Amino acid sequence: MLLFLWIETSNEYFNFDWVIFLGTGYWFYWSIFILSLAGILTAYSSLLLLLGLLLLWEGIELYLHLCHKILILLVILPCVILMFIICKFWKERWLVAGLSLQIFAPYVHLVSITVMVILFWPVAIYVARLEREVRMRRYRMTHSEKKRLKKCNVIARLRGLQVAVGLPFLLIFLSLCLMPLGIYSPCIQEKENLGPKPTLFGHRGAPMLGPENTMMSFEKAVEHGAHGLETDVHLSYDRVPFLMHDFDLRRTTNIREVQPESAFKNPATFSWDFLSTLNAGKWFVKPELKPFYNMKPLSKADKERARNQSIPTLADLLTLAKKERKFVIFDLRGPPPRHPLRHTFVRQVVSVILASKIEQHLIFWLPAHDRRYVRSMAPGFQHVGHLVSVKTLAKNNISIINVDYKKLFPNGLRDYKAANIRINVYTINEPWLFSLAWCSRINSVTTDNIGLLSQLNHPHFFMTPKFYMFIWLLVDIISVLFIVAIFCFHWRRETIKEKLFETSSTLTDTQSRSENEEDLHIAMKPARVVESPWTLAALYPALSKSGKEHQGRFNFAAPSKKLVPIKNAVTPLKPGKHDIQPPMPTTVFELTQAPSRQAKSKATFQTTLPTLKVDKPTMPSVEVPYP
C-alpha cells in the first residue's frame, strides 16, 4: 500500500522535498529515498512470503531466523510511521491516489484478472486434494463403521476448508469480472467528445530547463510553446516588484556566501540594489541541488548561461510577455510588517504593469486583495478566482478559476463546466495527470515539466467505450476458460490418484486375506503333510484304511455334537522278549534343532515310544472331538 501510494503521488515529489528543506535547510531527494526504501522493503517482504509458501508447499516446517524477525520489525516500523505522517499531515496524497484510479482502474482490472487466474492454480490444487481426501476417507469409512461419526466430523471439516478457500476466491473473481460496471474514467469516451489539448502555463518558467524564476527559465518556457507564464512576486524594501518563490533566499541564491547571517530573512526586507547583486543560477548547476531528479542534463552553453542568472524584476517578465504575447499569472506575496508598502503593495504592482504597456487582457489577475481598485484602474485584466461556489464567482463577475488539481476533481468539476467557467489547474507534471485533465476538458494547466507535456499530442490511456467493452469481455471469457481448464485438470489428476489408491487398497486387502488364509492353512496341516515316513501309518498302511471309519488324530473331521463313549476294546501291547528294534519315530510338533553341516547329520524328530510287538493291530472306532 505504501509503495503504491508513493508511486502514484510522484507529481508531489518536489513539494515534499521542498517542505523538508524548509525544516532542515538541506536539499536532498527525500522522496526518491522513500520510494527506494519502500521498493526494497516490499521486495524483501514479497520474497520472504514467497519462500514461506514454497516451504509450506514442500511440507517443510517454517523457522524464521532472528535476523529476519528484526528485519521484519524494521520493515513494519517505518511503514507505520510514514503512514501516520501521511494520514496526519498529508491527507491530500490519498486524493492523488484516488485520482490515479480514474486513469488506471481499467488497467488495474485487466491485471487483476490475470493475477487471479495465476493464483487459481494453487487454489485448484488445494481444493482438488481436499476433495480426494474426502473421498478416500469415505472409502475407508465403509470398512470401519464403528468410527463413522468421527469420520463424518473429519469430512465436515474438510468440506469447510474447501468452502473457506474456494468461495472467497470465486467471490473476488466474480467481483473483478463485474468491476467495469462501477468504473468511471474520463479517458473512456468517444473520440468526438474529447476536448482540445489544455494550454500550458510555465510554472516559474521552465524549472527543469533553467533556474526557476529567472529570465532563462521563462525564455525556455516560451521556446517550448508555453501559452502563459506563472511566477511569484515580492516587493523589495525600496518598492521594486521582483520574482521569488520562497520566503527566504537560501535555496535559489548565493546569500549564504554573501551574507550568511541574512539567509533566513524575508526577501522583502532587502533593497533592490542588494538583491540585484545576488546570483540566482549557480545552485542550479550543482548536481546535489538539482530541484528535480528526472531533469535532463544541461549542455555546456546552458550551464554557462545558468551560472550568470540574477533575480529578475516583474518589469523584465512583462517585457518578455509583451514581446511574445504570452499570458502572465502570478501570486502576489504581501510584504511583512513595517514594510513601506504593507497596505499599498497591490496598487504599486498595478502601476508597474500599466507602465509596461502590456495588453491588459494578457494579465490574469489572481490576488483577491483590493480587487475593486484593480477593476477601476485596469478594466482589461482577466480576474481569476479560487475554489469557491459558482454563485460566489458569478457575484464577483469572475469566469476563470485557478485551483489545485487535488481539490478540483473531487469537488464539482461538472458544476464549473456547466457554468462555462474556465479552469486552470496546478501543478501538473506527470503525463497521466495531464491526460486526466485533457480528458476532463480542463482549459489550461500550470506545469514544471513543460518540455515533456508540450510533446504530447494525444492523452495517454485513452480508449473508446466499445473497445474497452471488447477487451473486458475478451479477458473475462479467456480467464473463465483458463480457470475451468485448470480446475478440470487438477480434478482429473486427483481422481486418477484416487482410483489408483482404491485399486491398490483392493489388491492389498485381497492379498492380506490370502496371506491370512495361508497362515491358517499352514497352522492346521493335515496328517499326510506333516507325517514322517517313520510313523505307524507309513509303516502299516492298513491302519489308515477306511478313513471314514477310522478318524485319526490328524484327520480334520468335523466333531460330532454327541460324543461316542470310548470302549476299552484295545488289547494292551506287550513288547516281545527278543524283539528289540530301534525306536520308531512318531510325529510331534517340536522339532529339534538341525546340527551343523560339519557333523553331516540330519534333523530328526524326537521319539517317545519304544519298540512294540503287535500281533494284530486294531483301531477302535472312536471319534474324538478336535480340541
Swiss-Prot record:
One of its GO terms (biological process) is lipid metabolic process. Its main location: membrane. It holds the Pfam family GDPD. Glycans are attached at N308, N397. SUPFAM superfamilies: PLC-like phosphodiesterases (SSF51695). A divalent metal cation binds at E230, D232, H245. This is Glycerophosphodiester phosphodiesterase domain-containing protein 4. Coiled coil: none annotated. One of its GO terms (cellular component) is membrane. The chain crosses the membrane at residues 18-38, 40-60, 70-90, 108-128, 163-183, 469-489. It is found in: Membrane. Residues 1-17, 61-69, 129-162, 490-627 are cytoplasmic. InterPro entries: GP_PDE_dom (IPR030395), PLC-like_Pdiesterase_TIM-brl (IPR017946). Residues 39, 91-107, 184-468 are extracellular. It is an enzyme of class 3 (hydrolase). Belongs to the glycerophosphoryl diester phosphodiesterase family. GO terms for molecular function: glycerophosphodiester phosphodiesterase activity; metal ion binding. It comes from Macaca fascicularis. Its EC number is 3.1.-.-. Residues 198-457 form the GP-PDE domain. Gene3D superfamilies: Phosphatidylinositol (PI) phosphodiesterase. Keywords: Glycoprotein, Hydrolase, Membrane, Metal-binding, Transmembrane, Transmembrane helix. It is a multi-pass membrane protein.
